[in-house]
Structures are given as structure tokens and as C-alpha cells.
Regions:
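Acidic, glycine-rich active-site loops and adjacent beta-strand->loop/helix elements
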Residues: 74, 147, 179-180, 202
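Conserved active-site-proximal phosphate/metal-binding subdomains
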Residues: 152-175, 181-327
Length: 327
């Protein structure tokens, strides 16, 4: 059940992708997601040198024989990123899947990857951008609703509206992202026309996720109202968990502060301190509204399997109700 073009293209057991998360998607975490039947996704931008990235790719390969992917960020960055260095490793190490996010993926990059047999994905926040990626030649797209954690764009379109629009407009498979945290959301995304889902925030509350226990406990206690969009004044809107750092960023933006003042709070160094040391107010954490549906820490495999099993149970209940209604 739930075999779609996404599972065919990615070679996964389930049509589920574990979204890459900066500072969090370690090789061990990525491999755990892939071993659970989903697609683990590395964040190439976590690695400052080609050697470090190659070592991380090899570490993933040593921990799983299942497919995994690498995200290439095409967003503007304060630290210059030479994606060519990552691409060389991807091709040399036979990485099976590459996801791009941010600007439209260059056609020459896609051609090189596809010539090597790499499955290509693009993550975007609008139908227009998804169509552009399809024209560029990607194999599938993840379309990201505004409920999601991370870069949600400026349009404010919800997953409920965005996914059927994308599914109607595109010929390639669509994955839904944004606020999906259980089997109900997974099944709803398929009903809307998606052929799979990308989840991120839900995976923060897993045993394998390498964030501090203090932060996991804080997320357990969080509600669906405990997120907010920030960085809109930098045209890089991000939905974040509502902590002191995120509220400070929002305050600075309201005051008309310059980019450097804002980034001094939203800096990745602060986020790393939060993730590693457990100071839950030290930095900004991307977080979806789906955090309100999360109440306990489980193994990754249990989260993935539970999502699929819950969706199956819902279908069985529907089938039983329909059968009773026709007798």
C-alpha cells in the first residue's frame, strides 16, 4: 500500500522524505531515516570543506544500504557556497538522490546529475516555481506550505490549498510538505493529489535526532501556536519555534533594524549552541505548526511506520463505513 511514483523513483519503502535540517541532519540521523523505509536527506551546507562532506557521505553509506539524498542549497548565503565541490563528491560517491532548494536549479547541473543516474528533486513554495523546476528537468518536486518549519516564502499559501493546485498543474510527482506530523496528515496529502510527503519537525522528537534533551522536552510542551514567521524583512521568511531568540528577531524587524543586527541573533552559531548545549533560548529553530501534534519521543522507525499504519487504519475505517452504507 502507498506505492507511488515517488517510491518508484526514490527506491524507498514508503513515499516519505525526511527533510534536511541544517546542523541536525548528521550522517547517523540520515541513515536512521533511510533504514526506516523513508529517504534520509543530508544538508551539504553543513560541511565547509569537500573532504568533510565526502567523509559524511561515506559515513551514511557505511550505516545504510538504502537510498539517501543530498540537499544543495541555492539560497543566497553569508558564507559563500561552491556547490561544484559538493557535486563532485555526489558523482564520485554515487549518491542516488539530489534535492535542490532556493533558486531554480540550473539546467546544466540537472543534466550532469541525470546523466549519472541521479534522481533530482526541487523544493519550492509555489506552483509557479514548481512549474519552473519541471521545465528545468527535475524528476519530482516538494511543494512547501506555509505551516511548515523553515523557509516558507512570502506567499503564505497553506498546504491544503497549495498541494491540489500543484498536483493539477504538474506532470511530475509532487511531495507535500508543511505541518504534516502524523498519519492523518500523510493520508490527507495523498488525498489532495500528492504522491508522497516530506516531514521535518516531526523527526525532531525521535531518539536518533541529535538535539539536546532540553530542546526535545520544550518541543513536547509546545503547542500549534508556538511558532512564528520571522526574517520577512530580509525576504527570507522562516517559520520558527517561538522562543526568546525568535521573538527578539521579530522585535528587531519591527524596529527596522538592519540585517546585521538581525543576523547577530539568528546566526547559525547561536542555533548550534541551542542544539548542542541545551540553552533553548540561545538561537532560532525552524519549526512547523505540526509541533502541536507531537507529544513524545520515539525511534525514527516507529514514527515512520506509525504514520503509515495510522493512514491504513483510517482507510480501513472509511471502507467499513462505505460498505455498511451500501448494504
Amino acid at each position: 500500500m502507498f506505492q507511488t511514483r515517488v517510491t518508484q523513483l526514490l527506491g524507498t519503502e514508503y513515499p516519505i522524505v525526511g527533510g534536511c535540517m541544517m546542523h541536525i541532519s548528521t550522517p547517523e540521523f540520515v541513515a536512521a531515516i533511510s533504514n526506516a523505509g523513508a529517504l534520509g536527506m543530508m544538508a551539504s551546507a553543513m560541511y565547509e570543506t569537500q573532504e568533510d562532506f565526502r567523509e559524511a557521505v561515506r559515513r551514511v553509506k557505511s550505516l545504510t544500504d538504502k537510498p539517501f539524498g543530498v540537499n544543495l542549497s541555492l539560497f543566497p548565503a553569508l558564507r559563500p557556497i561552491d556547490n561544484e565541490l559538493y557535486v563532485e563528491v555526489i558523482l564520485e560517491e554515487n549518491v542516488p538522490v539530489v534535492e535542490t532548494s532556493g533558486h531554480r536549479p540550473p539546467e546544466d547541473l540537472l543534466a550532469r546529475l541525470k546523466a549519472a543516474g541521479v534522481v533530482t528533486m526541487h523544493k519550492c513554495v509555489s506552483v509557479r516555481h514548481a512549474l519552473s523546476a519541471q521545465r528545468a528537468g527535475v524528476d519530482l518536486v516538494t511543494v512547501f506550505g506555509s505551516e511548515g518549519g523553515g523557509h516558507i516564502g512570502e506567499l503564505g499559501l497553506s498546504t491544503l490549498v497549495l498541494i491540489p493546485l500543484a498536483a493539477d498543474a504538474l506532470e511530475i510527482p509532487v511531495l507535500a510538505a508543511g505541518g504534516i506530523a502524523d498519519g492523518r496528515g500523510f493520508l490527507a496529502a495523498l488525498a489532495l493529489g500528492a504522491e508522497g510527503v516530506t516531514i521535518g519537525t516531526r523527526l525532531l522528537l525521535t531518539e536518533e535526532c541529535p538535539i539536546h534533551p532540553n530542546l526535545k522536552q520544550a518541543l513536547i510542551e509546545a503547542r500549534e501556536t508556538d511558532t512564528l514567521p520571522i526574517l520577512g524583512t530580509l525576504h527570507n521568511t522562516l517559520r520558527a519555534w517561538r522562543n526568546e531568540a525568535a521573538l527578539k528577531v521579530a522585535e528587531l524587524e519591527q524596529q527596522g533594524a538592519d540585517m546585521w543586527a538581525i543576523l547577530s541573533v539568528a546566526a547559525g552559531t547561536n542555533t548550534r549552541r541551542m542544539l548542542q548545549d541545551g540553552d533553548v533560548n540561545a538561537g532560532v529553530l525552524a519549526c512547523s505548526q505540526g509541533v502541536g501534534l507531537m507529544r513524545e519521543v520515539k525511534p525514527v522507525a516507529e514514527v515512520i511506520r506509525g504514520m503509515v499504519e495510522e493512514a491504513q487504519e483510517i482507510l480501513q475505517r472509511w471502507e467499513g463505513t462505505t460498505n455498511r452504507g451500501t448494504n
